[in-house]
């Protein structure tokens, strides 16, 4: 850790230690700081690079740190033990005995209970990593294979419930299988609460998305952007006539019903971090970062 980064870490520890009081026992406090120190360099670099020039950068970091503390305090003890095991096992995910299996829940076993009933079969195959393709609540109608989520915290009703997912994660972990879930980062469905509130003209939620009153800027972007689905969804922007009362263009990299999130807005980062902690504390041992190359929009680039 470089001296200036070490100084930043020590300052965080000095200023923020009070947040841990009453949340955790002394052992967990010590483990939290050890793990935070281990990953602080990466965290500091990313946040400083993307948001360090903001006047409220320290305030935003304080909010993020507070949520880290809360999420760790809420984390089940077996998952805390697993965290330590993985931290002590270099490149555990690249071991030669790691064998992955990817499937849609309904195609493989009907629903989440069905997957629990097939864990022994997965063990026989030597599977140690199970990636269940998107199983959270999608929008009605076309949903890009489940990647157009209307509710990122609710399981599709035909597959089960959040409690079913939690139980499955426990059963898999006890059999030595890591559960992988998709963290859909780039977009939400237009039926998602954030999109609906943006549609209604709420300024807070309009800022969650990339929207344009006219084509001046978006035409400049369009000159260097590829088309992901040129036949079925040409272009990268969609006109939404009812948005905010006067209509606006929305950045839609994939389909017109998938609205790209605006990561230059720290509020979006806080929301996604909350979702990440939610899935991790449910028992997801791996989060697949969907469409990550498209997150940060820059004029003149291909994303």
Question: Which residues does each predicted region cover?
Answer:
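Acidic/aromatic-lined carbohydrate-recognition and catalytic surfaces
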Residues: 1-265, 269-270, 281, 292-303
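Active-site regions of oxyanion-processing enzymes, predominantly non-cytosolic
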Residues: 279-280, 285-289
């Amino acid at each position: 850790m470089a001296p200036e980064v070490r100084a930043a870490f020590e300052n965080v520890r000095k200023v923020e230690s009070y947040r841990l009081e009453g949340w955790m026992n002394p052992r967990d406090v010590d483990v939290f700081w050890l793990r935070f120190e281990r990953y602080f360099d990466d965290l500091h670099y990313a946040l400083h690079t993307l948001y360090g020039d903001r006047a409220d950068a320290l305030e935003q970091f304080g909010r993020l740190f507070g949520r880290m503390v809360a999420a760790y305090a809420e984390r089940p003890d077996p998952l805390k033990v697993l965290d330590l095991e993985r931290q002590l096992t270099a490149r555990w995910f690249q071991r030669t005995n790691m064998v992955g299996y990817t499937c849609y829940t309904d195609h493989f076993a009907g629903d989440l209970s069905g997957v629990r009933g097939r864990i022994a079969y997965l063990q026989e195959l030597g599977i140690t990593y199970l990636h269940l393709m998107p199983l959270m609540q999608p929008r009605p109608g076309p949903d890009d294979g489940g990647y157009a989520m209307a509710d990122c915290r609710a399981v599709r009703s035909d597959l089960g419930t959040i409690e079913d997912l939690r139980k499955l994660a426990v059963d898999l972990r006890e059999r030595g299988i890591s559960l992988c879930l998709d963290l859909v980062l780039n977009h939400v469905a237009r039926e998602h609460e954030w999109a609906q509130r943006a549609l209604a003209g709420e300024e807070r939620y309009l800022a969650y998305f990339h929207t344009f009153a006219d084509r001046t800027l978006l035409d400049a972007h369009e000159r260097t952007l590829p088309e992901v689905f040129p036949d079925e969804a040409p272009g990268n922007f969609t006109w939404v006539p009812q948005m905010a009362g006067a209509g606006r263009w929305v950045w839609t990299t994939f389909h017109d019903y998938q609205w790209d999130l605006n990561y230059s807005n720290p509020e979006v980062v806080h929301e996604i971090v909350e979702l990440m902690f939610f899935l991790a504390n449910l028992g997801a041992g791996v989060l697949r970062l969907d469409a990550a190359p498209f997150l940060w929009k820059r004029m003149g680039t291909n994303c």
